[in-house]
């Protein structure tokens, strides 16, 4: 009788006006309960589900967006300072940031394996393993950092080999030298970030990043204008700012009582299965790297066009604007990855699917608004970065391509977040190879160089690759069997209990 009464009470609660139950929905009426309540009309279930999911999603997405915007803003502010030193310095900083983003993508991608595992383990209430995953991932990423350090030490001859102008290559290599210590900051930052996100802890990272941005802008102004350190001063301050974030983030994880169940101190268990974890994270790294490197290749190819300085400056400004809007989508990427992995770990297939489409729709609407703002301000937006009229005109001409890219980026990163939450990274990596590097870049090179459409031609081809990838991910997500995904998540976590969690 008690079970029957509870069911009746829950149905009555669901049928009440939303204003009466709004504060109780996330805690007392779970999303899965709403979506599976057959006694409710379909529209009512969707409406209640949207209200619950938007609260859960935005609570994760908004702080995550702020974190990514601030972190992206650190790189953009460095370009702004460089741009006001001169066009050559702007080109050098742009080529340096674009080149260094390769290791950023690698570390971010490998860190995404933590997001899958920690998210599903947290949803299944296996809290004690989260700290082990964090330590193991940090060790693996730090080891990967050593060969990357050697690679970037030889950035000058590599840039020359890629056909970049000698002056830009030399100044860009000096700029990169000042960024090299960031490699190991990334190794700690991304694993800790995913550890926090899996537990829906995002706001503290936003506060830390905001403090770092203020520190960076202040110190950069001092080193550039008061101390006259120029481009190298900009690079050194950027590195210091990243290490400030890492130090504050690490201190928070170790000392906060909210992680008493998930962080139990350093453990020798973290040294076990490093090679297995490396293989698992490699799939995540390939997926993310292929996505992030794709846009950076556009900037590198611009250095081979007829007027490389103008092309680099205009495209780097467009990419900076695109990166800012992209951070909004990446925030939803992080949120939906946590939501889907938590729901799959908890055994809630309908909630995982509902979260996927809710995040995709909201991110798409925001991206359309952003694209309209870019088109409306196309003649003025570039003056934030430069005072050169020729560069401003070139940016204005490229804004329609930028607007289309922003809209596509409103969908694609969210679907990639779903892939991370579900553990589809390897499959998506193959999709990225085909769409980006077999279709997008070759078509872009043909249009840009053979048909002489220059930067517009390269960008057109790359938009085509992104569109193809987005359509494929939409289809795969639509066709997914979410009950099977729950079972896969359960088996993956059972493997962890068998002490062989990373064996496929």
Curated annotation (Swiss-Prot):
Coiled coil: none annotated. It is found in: Membrane. The keyword Lipid biosynthesis does not apply. GO terms for cellular component: membrane. Keywords: Membrane, Transmembrane, Transmembrane helix, Transport. Pfam families: MatE. One of its GO terms (biological process) is xenobiotic detoxification by transmembrane export across the plasma membrane. The keyword Transmembrane helix applies. The chain crosses the membrane at residues 56-76, 90-110, 139-159, 170-190, 208-228, 234-254, 273-295, 316-336, 356-376, 401-421, 433-453, 457-477. It is a multi-pass membrane protein. One of its GO terms (molecular function) is xenobiotic transmembrane transporter activity. Belongs to the multi antimicrobial extrusion (MATE) (TC 2.A.66.1) family. This is Protein DETOXIFICATION 38. It comes from Arabidopsis thaliana. The lineage of its organism: Eukaryota, Viridiplantae, Streptophyta, Embryophyta, Tracheophyta.
């Amino acid at each position: 009788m008690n079970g029957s009464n509870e069911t009746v009470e829950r149905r009555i609660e669901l049928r009440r006006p939303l204003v009466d139950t709004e504060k109780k929905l996330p805690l007392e009426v779970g999303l899965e309960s709403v979506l599976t309540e057959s006694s409710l009309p379909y529209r009512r279930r969707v409406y209640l589900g949207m209200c619950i999911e938007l609260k859960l999603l935005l609570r994760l997405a908004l702080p995550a967006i702020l974190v990514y915007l601030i972190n992206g803003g650190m790189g953009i502010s460095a370009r702004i300072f460089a741009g006001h030193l001169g066009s050559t310095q702007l080109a050098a900083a742009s080529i340096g940031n674009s080149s260094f983003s390769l290791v950023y993508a690698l570390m971010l991608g490998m860190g995404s394996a933590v997001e899958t595992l920690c998210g599903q383990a947290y949803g299944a209430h296996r809290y004690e393993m989260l700290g082990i995953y964090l330590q193991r991932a940090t060790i693996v990423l730090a080891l990967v950092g050593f060969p990357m350090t050697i690679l970037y030490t030889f950035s000058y001859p590599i840039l020359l080999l890629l056909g970049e102008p000698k002056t830009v290559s030399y100044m860009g290599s000096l700029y990169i030298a000042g960024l090299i210590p960031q490699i190991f900051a990334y190794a700690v930052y991304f694993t800790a970030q995913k550890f926090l996100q899996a537990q829906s802890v995002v706001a503290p990272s936003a506060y830390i990043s905001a403090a770092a941005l203020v520190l960076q802008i202040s110190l950069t102004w001092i080193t550039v204008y008061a101390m006259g350190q120029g481009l190298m001063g900009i690079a050194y301050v950027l590195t210091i700012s990243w290490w400030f974030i890492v130090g504050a983030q690490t201190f928070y994880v170790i000392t906060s009582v909210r992680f008493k169940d998930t962080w139990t101190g350093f453990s020798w268990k973290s040294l076990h299965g490093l090679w297995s974890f490396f293989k698992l994270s490699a799939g995540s790294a390939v997926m993310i790297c292929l996505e992030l490197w794709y846009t950076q290749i556009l900037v590198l190819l611009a250095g081979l066009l007829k007027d490389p300085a103008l092309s680099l400056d205009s495209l780097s400004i467009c990419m900076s604007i695109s990166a800012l809007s992209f951070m909004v989508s990446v925030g939803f990427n992080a949120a939906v990855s946590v939501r889907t992995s938590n729901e799959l770990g908890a055994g809630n297939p309908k909630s995982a699917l509902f979260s996927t489409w809710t995040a995709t729709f909201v991110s798409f609407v925001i991206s359309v608004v952003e694209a309209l703002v870019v088109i409306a301000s196309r003649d003025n937006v570039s003056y934030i970065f430069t005072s050169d009229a020729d560069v401003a005109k070139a940016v204005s001409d490229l804004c329609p391509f930028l607007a289309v890219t922003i809209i596509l980026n409103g969908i694609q990163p969210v679907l990639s977040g779903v892939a991370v939450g579900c553990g589809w990274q390897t499959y998506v990596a193959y999709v990225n190879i085909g769409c980006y590097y077999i279709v997008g870049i070759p078509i872009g090179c043909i249009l840009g160089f053979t048909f002489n459409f220059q930067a517009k031609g390269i960008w057109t081809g790359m938009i085509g690759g992104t569109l193809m990838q987005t359509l494929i991910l939409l289809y795969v997500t639509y066709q997914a069997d979410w009950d099977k995904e729950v079972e896969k998540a359960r088996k993956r976590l059972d493997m962890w209990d068998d002490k062989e969690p990373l064996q496929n």
